């Protein structure tokens, strides 16, 4: 009878361990990947056509509170197609920065690094649909809509400071 009780107890402990392990696997790591296609609306003198392209943003779980704002560290990588008087060039974007979010609705993010051939910044600000997507619809994604802008000390390799801006729509996936 004792061996039957011990076997039952071991089976119960094993089942509980499996349940705990299963719960751990479903827990999010706090990172997100976001892809933001951008349609250019304004351009600097370096461009005859407004650049179009996309930026990939990797948001980390690392950050802190700044009063009512949530700050998180992120990195951005992107590629855009530009043109000046028939000559095509493709500025890339690589930067490290952060995101500020107010009430899971209004956001602003900035990244400093390389834009084209020079140092530069990327900014993206607007509204987040996080509350609707995650709380209302229980989806692991977020949609952000806003203005996106780029400024560089040397976009095309010609040594001139320029930039562009446009409308960005980003889809973030949390994992």
PLM segments and residue spans:
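Transmembrane beta-strand segments that form the barrel wall of outer-membrane beta-barrel proteins
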Residues: 31-43, 69-81, 105-118, 128, ...
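Outer-membrane beta-barrel channels and translocator barrels
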Residues: 61-69, 103-107, 130-138, 174
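Solvent-exposed loop/turn segments connecting transmembrane beta-strands
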Residues: 42-52, 65, 81-90, 111-124, ...
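Outer-membrane beta-barrel architecture
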Residues: 57-61, 97-101, 124-128, 170-172
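Mid-chain, structured segments of secreted extracytoplasmic proteins
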Residues: 71-100
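Ligand-binding grooves and catalytic loops that recognize ribose/phosphate and carbohydrate rings
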Residues: 133-175
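Short hydrophobic/aromatic-rich motifs at helix boundaries and adjacent loops
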Residues: 29, 95-101, 140-141
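Short glycine/proline- and aromatic-enriched beta-strand/turn motifs that initiate or cap beta-hairpins
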Residues: 1-66, 164-175
């Amino acid at each position: 009878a004792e061996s039957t009780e011990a076997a039952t107890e071991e089976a119960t402990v094993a089942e509980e361990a499996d349940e705990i392990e299963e719960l751990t696997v479903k827990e999010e790591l706090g990172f997100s990947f976001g892809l933001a296609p951008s349609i250019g609306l304004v351009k600097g003198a370096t461009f005859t056509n407004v650049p179009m392209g996309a930026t990939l943003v990797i948001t980390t779980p690392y950050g802190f509170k700044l009063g009512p704002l949530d700050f998180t560290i992120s990195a951005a990588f992107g590629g855009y197609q530009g043109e000046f008087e028939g000559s095509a060039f493709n500025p890339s974007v690589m930067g490290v920065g952060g995101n500020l979010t107010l009430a899971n609705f209004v956001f602003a993010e900035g990244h400093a690094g390389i834009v084209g051939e020079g140092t530069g910044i990327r900014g993206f600000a607007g509204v987040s649909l996080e509350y609707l997507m995650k709380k209302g619809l229980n989806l692991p994604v977020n949609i952000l809509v806003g203005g996106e802008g780029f400024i560089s000390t040397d976009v095309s390799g010609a040594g001139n400071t320029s930039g562009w801006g446009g409308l960005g729509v980003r889809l973030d996936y949390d994992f």
